[in-house]
């Protein structure tokens, strides 16, 4: 009988974790009380029961409800101390799940009004990351993400800012929010600015919309990675293209089910992507709202898709290779994966 190893001890990289969505439920409730923020009852009741709220974002009404909960949680982050707490706790949760490298995704414009402006907000976040790296030992960097529901000119401003802070811990540029709003090509100039500044291109695509949105990310934004990308499984030619170019898809199985992209964990096409040779980096997306963190995604691959420990190890390797980690860090993590397999 094959030995079943603990996936929380498997060294890995975490490439798809949103800033506010990384918060512990207990932290959210404490910060809401601290700042006098009244959270939606659906959120407080679910978290009070130790559950995640019931979500489904496959239509605009469902997405609006999801965004409302997310915005309410974000409103509880009001001081540099709140930011530091969130970043440190996100790192602690990742370390507990075996992550040695975390790229946390944030749109600093969302925090600017409470933190003194756009530049102070990003600097506070980067300072928190630097302190957390020093205190915990985790490798951690920031991916700055534009909001596709805002004007493309805003994205260009954000891209320039991201490049300016590339030496302070920004490693990539993304595009998030509802894929059904705004065309990828509208943001091509922002991504060109980011690429010219040496940042990874990691836009969202292939989650709420089909394979066409993944193609748009490749064609218009020259994506190095795709946030989600799971709907590429519906197009064999696109799968081959992703595999040939070794574009990493940041697949978030629990999130896909929670938002109604797929009905059940076994419906998420992990096996199809894996066998097509598409690199994947499993991610937790928004644990606050979806109720599961990084190691749980590997458990889904094992329990619902029959991934062996050797295959789980390869998933971990793919996450490391797809990261912006320095080669020395990648080498250490990859060696750790090999050790996990022979232990």
From Swiss-Prot:
Alphabetically ordered keywords of this record: Hydrolase, Metal-binding, Nucleotide metabolism, Zinc
Residues given in the record as substrate binding sites: 18, 286
One family name in Pfam for this protein: A_deaminase
EC number: 3.5.4.-
PROSITE patterns attached to this UniProt entry: A_DEAMINASE (PS00485)
Site (Important for catalytic activity): 228
Binding site for Zn(2+): 16, 18, 204, 285
InterPro entries: A/AMP_deam_AS, A_deaminase_dom, Ado/ade_deaminase, Metal_Hydrolase
Top-rank EC class of the record's enzyme: hydrolase
Gene Ontology annotations of biological process type: nucleotide metabolic process; purine ribonucleoside monophosphate biosynthetic process
SUPFAM superfamilies from the UniProt entry: Metallo-dependent hydrolases
UniProt-recorded Gene Ontology molecular function terms: deaminase activity; hydrolase activity, acting on carbon-nitrogen (but not peptide) bonds, in cyclic amidines; metal ion binding
Cofactor section: Zn(2+)
Record: active site: 207 (proton donor)
UniProt-listed CDD domains: ADA
Cofactor note: Binds 1 zinc ion per subunit.
Function, in words: Putative nucleoside deaminase. May catalyze the hydrolytic deamination of adenosine or some similar substrate and play a role in purine metabolism.
NCBIfam families cross-referenced by the UniProt entry: aden_deam (TIGR01430), PRK09358.1-5 (NF006849)
Similarity remark: Belongs to the metallo-dependent hydrolases superfamily. Adenosine and AMP deaminases family.
Name this protein carries in UniProt: Putative adenosine/adenine deaminase
């Amino acid at each position: 009988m094959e030995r079943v190893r603990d996936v929380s001890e498997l060294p890995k990289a975490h490439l798809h974790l949103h800033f506010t969505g990384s918060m512990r439920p207990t932290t959210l409730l404490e910060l809401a009380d601290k700042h006098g923020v009244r959270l939606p009852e659906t959120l407080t009741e679910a978290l009070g029961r130790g559950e995640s709220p019931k979500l489904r974002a496959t239509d605009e009404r469902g997405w609006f409800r999801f965004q409302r909960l997310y915005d309410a949680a974000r409103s509880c982050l009001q001081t540099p101390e709140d930011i530091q707490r969130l970043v440190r706790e996100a790192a602690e949760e990742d370390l507990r799940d075996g992550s040695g490298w975390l790229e946390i995704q944030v749109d600093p414009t969302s925090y600017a009004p409470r933190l003194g402006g756009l530049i102070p907000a990003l600097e506070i976040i980067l300072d928190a990351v630097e302190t957390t790296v020093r205190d915990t030992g985790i490798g951690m960097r920031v991916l700055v993400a534009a909001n596709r529901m805002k004007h493309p000119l805003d994205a260009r401003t954000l891209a320039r800012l991201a490049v300016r802070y590339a030496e302070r811990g920004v490693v990539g540029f993304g595009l998030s929010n509802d894929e059904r709003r705004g065309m990828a090509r509208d943001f091509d100039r922002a991504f060109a600015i980011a690429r010219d500044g040496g940042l990874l291109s990691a836009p969202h695509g292939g989650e709420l919309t089909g394979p066409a949105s993944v193609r748009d990310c490749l064609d218009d934004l020259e994506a190095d990675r795709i946030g989600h990308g799971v709907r590429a499984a519906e197009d064999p030619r696109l799968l081959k293209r992703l595999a040939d170019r070794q574009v990493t898809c940041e697949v978030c199985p629990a999130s896909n089910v929670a938002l109604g992209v797929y009905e059940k964990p076994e419906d998420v096409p992990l096996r199809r992507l894996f066998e097509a040779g598409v690199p994947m980096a499993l991610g937790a997306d928004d644990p606050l709202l979806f109720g599961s963190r990084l190691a749980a995604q590997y458990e889904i691959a094992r329990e619902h898709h029959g991934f062996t420990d050797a295959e789980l190890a390869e998933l971990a390797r793919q996450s490391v290779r797809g990261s912006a980690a320095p080669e020395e860090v990648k080498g250490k993590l990859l060696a750790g994966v090999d050790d996990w397999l022979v232990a």
